[in-house]
Amino acid sequence: MRVAMMAAFAGAITFAGPAFALDKVTFGTNWVADPEAGGYYQALEDGTYAKYGLDVTILQGGPTSNGGMLLIAGKIEFFMGGDMIGDFLAVQNNIPTIAVAAHFQKNPQIFMSHPGVGLDKWQDLPNANPAFVSAGAVNTFWAWMRLAYGFKDDNIKPYNFNSAPFIAEPHSIQQGYLTSEPLEVERQGGFKPNVFLLADYGYTTYSTIVETRREIVEKHPDIVQRFVDASSIGWYHYLYGDNSKANEAIKRENPEITDDQIAFSIGKMKEYGIVDSGDTLKLGVGAMTDERWSGFYNTMVKAGVVKSGIDYKKAYTLQFVNKGVGLDLRPK
């Protein structure tokens, strides 16, 4: 398996080579190896990328990495971005990147509450005090929550990615990620928290968005198409097939992850339709639509997260998705 750390890269990977050679590309993830990138590891490990003529290196991210900058600098060809806000900000700041697929139809961002204390429904949460929210969230999804549901800034306490304060305060709420924090709370606190997926309450951004540079789309559309198709097939195989080799690869790259965590993450992605739901049921995994992009852009403008008047359509292209690739791989 060709997975490298960021320090190994001194220059851009080129596409040139003999006709019989696989096209070499590097895909950077936005975090350390985990099931949330499982479809890409699956496509690498089960030979799907090779079948599509690609020699893919997965460059795992982490707390000190910046794969987005590597993409801009030409050090990698594809990057696993976060949500659509980053793509809007790229347009706003004239950064020449573009979204070519969305492998999470729902953003896994959640809020959690303690059960049985009057915070069991979404409509109970705006008055919860304290609300443990990170600095980055205050100006993104919390801004939407404040506008759409009346959540209060006065209730915020800093969330430093440690759930102990939330566990200790029964009337608090805390942000989290569907596939990780609920299990952490269950392990450390001894209870199952209430989980509220923001996507189910109107936070309609895509996530795990495959990004590349505009020049690659213009000069090498065939490579982009093959990478998108193979990655989407990888996600079908990871969710519905034998994912053991991908999980072993994830554990090699991230020795701290446990089998329980992997199983929990995969289970939640399937239970909540993170990858395969909505438009993907007809268009295929990775699907995107103009309506979703325009709707979320308008929502973020109203919330003050992005500027009005930018050409948000430059943030993405539908050229490589919505072709039904892999639909036959979903269990009947």
Give, region by region, the residue ranges found by the protein language model.
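Secondary-structure end/capping motifs
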Residues: 218-305
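Conserved C-terminal helix/tail region of periplasmic/extracytoplasmic solute-binding proteins
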Residues: 290-332
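Bacterial N-terminal signal peptides that target proteins for export
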Residues: 1-6
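Short helix-capping segments at alpha-helix termini
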Residues: 20, 48-51, 149-151, 188-190, ...
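Pocket-lining segment of extracytoplasmic ligand-binding domains
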Residues: 85, 161-258
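N-terminal signal peptide c-region/cleavage motif recognized by signal peptidases
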Residues: 16-18
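Short, glycine-/small- and polar/acidic-enriched structural segments
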Residues: 22-179, 196, 204
